[in-house]
Amino acid sequence: MATLRADEISNIIRERIEQYTTEVKIVNTGTVLQVGDGIARIHGLDEVMAGELVEFEEGTIGIALNLESNNVGVVLMGDGLMIQEGSSVKATGRIAQIPVSEAYLGRVINALAKPIDGRGEIPASESRLIESPAPGIISRRSVYEPMQTGLIAIDSMIPIGRGQRELIIGDRQTGKTAVATDTILNQKGQNVICVYVAIGQKASSVAQVVTTFQEQGAMEYTIVVAETADAPATLQYLAPYTGAALAEYFMYRERHTSIIYDDPSKQAQAYRQMSLLLRRPPGREAYPGDVFYLHSRLLERAAKSSSRLGEGSMTALPIVETQAGDVSAYIPTNVISITDGQIFLSADLFNSGIRPAINVGISVSRVGSAAQIKAMKQVAGKLKLELAQFAELEAFAQFASDLDKATQNQLARGQRLRELLKQSQAAPLTVGEQILTIYTGTNGYLDSLEIGQVKKFLVELRTYLKTNKPQFQEIISSTKTLTEEAEVLLKEAIQEQTERFILQEQT
C-alpha cells in the first residue's frame, strides 16, 4: 500500500492554498412581507435604486417604485400568483430596458418588447432604456417639414409637421383611432417608421387595427405595441415608454418616425391604480400628484433633431377620450397643455354624417403653415376663411327667414366646402389630390352641382386628372408650388370633367 510522505502532503496543501481565489459576491436581497393586487412590499433590499428591476424567487420581475424607511413598494410585471410571503427577492442592478433593432418592423409586441404575434423571437443586438431623457434645447430644431395625414381637413387647416406633438381628442366612438390609423396608412412610401401603442384597449380592437395595417401593406414599416385591458397595470403604464424607446432608436439613426399613443388616459388610470395601492397621496380626480410628469416626460421625447444629430424626427399623436365633450377634465387639460395643438372630434358632427368628424373651428395646430408646402398654403387660406364665415352665417340663417342672394350663395358654397372635407376611412389622399379638391371648391366650380353630386364629381375629377393630366402631379411633386402652368392644367381638367359629368347626369 502506497504511503504519502509528510513533505508531499505539505506540497499538495501549499498548491491548493496558492490556487484558492477569494471572491466575495454581495447580493442585495429582501423578503416578501405582503403581496396582492399587483403590488409587493419587501423588507430588506437596502441599496435598491428607485425604478430598479427586482427578481422574485419564482421568476417574476418587478419595479421598485416606493422606497420607504422600513420596506420597499414593488409593482409586479406579471400576475404574481406564485409569490409567497417570506420568499426571497433580489435586486438586479438594472433599470428597465428593451432590445431594439430593425427586425421589430412588422411585428406585434408587448410592453417588454416580447413578440405576441406567434411569429417567433425577434433578433436584436442593441438595447435602450425604456425611460431615457428627452432631447435638450440644442439637440432640437423647429418643425418645418409637413407630415401628411392624407385627410384634407387636417393637412389644409390643422397641419402637422415632423417632430410635432398633436393631440387627437374627442368622445368615444367619434373616429379618433381612424384618424390615427389613416395617418399611418398615408406614410406608405414616405420613408417614415410608425409605432402604434395600444394601452388598455380591447384585444378585438387591436386585432382590427393590425388587420387593417396588413391588408393595406402598412405593417412593413409599422411596429404595434399592445397591452390590452386585461394586462397588469404595470405593463399598461410601461407600454407608451416602450413604444417611445423603439421610435427613438430610429430617430437617432436619422430616420423619420411617427408614434401614436392610444390612449394616455388609460395609462394614467393604470398609474393611478398603482399609486393608490402603493399608498401614495391622491390628488385631483384621485390621480397622484406627478401624473402631469407621467405624460410630459413621455411627450417631450418627440422632437425634430438638429442637423448635428442627423435631422431625424419623432412625431407624437396622443389620443385622449373625453366624457360628454368635457375637455376641462384633468387628463385632457394636462395633455392639451403639453402638446403643440389639438384636433377635436365632435360626436354631433359624427352623428350628422360628417366624417372625419373634425371640428375645424376649435381645432388648432401651433406649428401652423410652417408645416405646409407652398402649394397647400396657396389654396388652404381661402378654405379656412370661407368655412369660418359659413359657420357664422349658418348659425344666423337659422333665425332669418328671407336671405339675400349673396348670403344664399355663401351658404351654398359653405355646404359644398363642408362636403369636400368628407372622406371614407382608409382612403387617404395625396397632396396633389387635396390641392385639386380644395381649389375646385374654393373657386366655385362645385356651386352649380347638387350637394349629393359633389363626392361623385370629385372622385371622377381626381381619376380624370391623374389619367389625362399627369403633368399636374409632377409639377406639384417637383416644385411644391401651384404654378401658373399647374393652375392652367387644373382649370382645363375641371372644365372638361364638368362637361362630361353634366352629360352623364342628363343621360
Swiss-Prot record:
GO terms for molecular function: ADP binding; ATP binding; proton-transporting ATP synthase activity, rotational mechanism. The record marks S363 as: Required for activity. CDD domains: ATP-synt_F1_alpha_C, ATP-synt_F1_alpha_N, F1-ATPase_alpha_CD. InterPro entries: ATP_synth_asu-like_sf, ATP_synth_asu_C, ATP_synth_asu_C_sf, ATP_synth_F1_a_nt-bd_dom, ATP_synth_F1_asu, ATPase_a/bsu_AS, ATPase_F1/V1/A1_a/bsu_N, ATPase_F1/V1/A1_a/bsu_N_sf. ATP binds at G170, D171, R172, Q173, T174, G175, K176, T177. It comes from the Eukaryota. It is found in: Plastid, Chloroplast thylakoid membrane. The keyword Membrane applies. It holds the Pfam family ATP-synt_ab. It catalyses: ATP + H2O + 4 H(+)(in) = ADP + phosphate + 5 H(+)(out). The keyword Chloroplast applies. Keywords: ATP synthesis, ATP-binding, CF(1), Chloroplast, Hydrogen ion transport, Ion transport, Membrane, Nucleotide-binding, Plastid, Thylakoid, Translocase, Transport. GO terms for cellular component: chloroplast thylakoid membrane; proton-transporting ATP synthase complex. It is a peripheral membrane protein. Its EC number is 7.1.2.2. Belongs to the ATPase alpha/beta chains family. F-type ATPases have 2 components, CF(1) - the catalytic core - and CF(0) - the membrane proton channel. CF(1) has five subunits: alpha(3), beta(3), gamma(1), delta(1), epsilon(1). CF(0) has four main subunits: a, b, b' and c. PANTHER family: ATP SYNTHASE SUBUNIT ALPHA, MITOCHONDRIAL. Produces ATP from ADP in the presence of a proton gradient across the membrane. The alpha chain is a regulatory subunit. HAMAP family: ATP_synth_alpha_bact. This is ATP synthase subunit alpha, chloroplastic. The gene is atpA.
